[in-house]
Amino acid sequence: MLYEQIQSNKRRTVFLLIGFLALVGIVGAAVGYLLLKSLVTGIIGALLVGVIYAVIMISNATDVVMAMNHGTEVTSADQAPELWHTVEDMAMVAQVPMPRVFIIEDESPNAFATGNNPKNAAVAATTGLIALMNRNELEGVIGHEISHVRNYDIRISTIALALTAAISFLINLGSNWWLFGSGSRDRDNRDSGGGGQLLVFILSLVVMIFAPLVAAVIQMAISRNREYLADAGSVALTRNPQELIAALRKLNSAPPMSHVDESSAALYISDPLKKKARLFDTHPPIEERIARLEKM
């Protein structure tokens, strides 16, 4: 079962990368038209941006994501003994190399894993998580993150994060140019042009508006399924669902994190933004996760 899940995640990685490039190309066409009146130039430029983002994120995933989330590396057990030894123990049980360990200075309890594969993975925990959880609950949370590492979920998450970051960059570039740059002077020309030109202009705006939602849908589909799988994986490592159940209840009642990179929100074990009733929530409701764990 584990081998099949790993292979499935690898196949999904390929499909996600194809979808990533396609979506970036569409956004590039829209931005290229708004900026340069050239769909082809926009597509080529956007694909170059997308490839650069993907390569950077995949090859330097740990350092990039940790920098985005203000993580500080723990280089020895003396710096954070409980966290260090918990990560060490869970990695040993899961039979994966010990990930690098990071701490995020934030009173809200949370954690995430990142990297490209189990050999260069990393686990981050907030100071709030270390302070709030007892050893068993901490094992449940870290077991969840180690399961992401073992199942290659971190690679999929890294590519999804690159997708979101690249699209945000392109849309911000296009929006700023259109509103404040020479694009603002071109609007009258486009409006007075032919109907076909105006139609392409409108479609370009529609793409820029809805592309982030498409990216969110992709992240949501990936994140929801992998969270359930990682919960089950944590129980397989700790042999006690009550550890993770207790931890999830504490996470559910915690306040939002003070400083968090929004594009990284899907990586965390619990929604760090604590936004209620979001249409495109990347996390399944904690109540549903607890209900599934109680049936194990």
Swiss-Prot record:
A GO molecular-function descriptor: metalloendopeptidase activity
Keyword Isomerase among UniProt keywords: no
Active-site residues from the entry: E145
Pfam families per UniProt: Peptidase_M48
Transmembrane segment boundaries: 14-34, 38-58, 159-179, 198-218
Record GO cellular component, one term: plasma membrane
Domain of life, per lineage: Bacteria
Cofactor: how and how many bound: Binds 1 zinc ion per subunit.
Membrane topology qualifier: Multi-pass membrane protein
Keywords: Cell membrane, Hydrolase, Membrane, Metal-binding, Metalloprotease, Protease, Transmembrane, Transmembrane helix, Zinc
Signal peptide feature range: none
E.C. designation(s): 3.4.24.-
Subcellular location(s) per record: Cell membrane
InterPro entries named in the record: HtpX_protease, Pept_M48_protease_HtpX, Peptidase_M48
Cofactor(s) it depends on: Zn(2+)
Entry binding sites for Zn(2+): H144, H148, E227
Catalytic EC class: hydrolase
Homology family: Belongs to the peptidase M48B family.
Protein name (Swiss-Prot/TrEMBL): Protease HtpX homolog
Gene transcribed to yield this protein: htpX
